[in-house]
Amino acid sequence: MRQFFISMLGTVFGIFVFFILFFFLIIGIGTIAGLSAADQSAGKQVLFMDLRQPVLDHTGAKPIFGAESASVVNIARSLNRAKKDDSIKGLFIRANEFGMVPASAEEIRLAILDFKESGKFVITHSQGFEGTTLTPYMAISASDEIWQQDTTGFAIAGLRSETGFYGGVFEKYDAKPQFEQFHEYKNAANVYTQTDYTDAHRESTNSLLTSLYDSMMAQISTDRKQSTEAVKAVFDTSPHSAEDAKKAGLIDVLGHYNAAREHAREKAGGKSVKFLPITNYAPKGYVTGPVIAFIGGQGPVVTGESADSSNPFATSLSMGGDSVAHAFDMAIKDKKVEAIVFRVSTPGGSPAASDQIHDAVARAKEAGKPVIISMGQYAASGGYYVAANADK
């Protein structure tokens, strides 16, 4: 019995110590967050954006542990606010060197153009565009100066799409894949039923790549103040050295990262200038008055709850019918909410969950709250269905 009470007291003491340590950990996190916010009032600053890190379409609630992940939506918001912030003198970017989703690259480019309307500079440094597609370059092509490390290559060559087909594999095990498909262009199931592209599948893939390529060429040529033909000629004869890319007008300065960073510091005002990570940037003051609610959904549409970036245990992202419908209900009940922006980035998924979200959009409209759709990386199948009933 004595041993039992000793063990019980030890357990209680251990739990007590755990909660004490957890309490001080939370205080520490709050203090660090406060210091990050305080840094924003420390004079002249340059926003720093590292596109080499994974960039989500949008993030969920801010996580308790760890830094908030970069996202396209937060980048656009931060740059739009920073252009009106007198303490922010410019933007310094480290370019992505591996590849980006085309829609994300285009939205980041548009956010940079919006930021530049303030007259503030944008400088980008790359450690080589080697083995990458067009998207990392297009994302930063609107920069005032594009730097590249002189010992690296410029190997951007265009776009490609690869599909693995498993048709015939199931038959070896006396299994037959069965899917419901609506017409020949609904080709998601082809990877399990075919051994190669069908004519319709090949046509849709080529059409998508051609459309993306032409759009990217037009945007890059506008940013670099060159003809589309001249820009295409460079990419069609890739790979190139950094020196040749500079001669072609696609790179402005050859140099290392530290030199580019110090150049940005001098341009902003000298040694006292600090670099502020864009994920730590928060505008000063509070917004009062009417509210526009933001509801986001990314990943496959599923029944039940969403899995988002705020959950440290989530292994993938999903757009849950219950979670999204509940968010709409909250916005409908909130008298301060005048309108709803619904960010959709999904390839589709559960018909039942898609219909649940479609109904939530309809209920918001019936309550007199306009619903505006912002499409992210994709809005296919059920993703387009949930958006179709919106006001715009």
Segments (PLM) and residue ranges:
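Extended, domain-scale alpha-helical bundle/helix-rich regions
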Residues: 236-240
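Small-residue-centered hinge/linker elements
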Residues: 1-228, 233, 265-372, 378-392
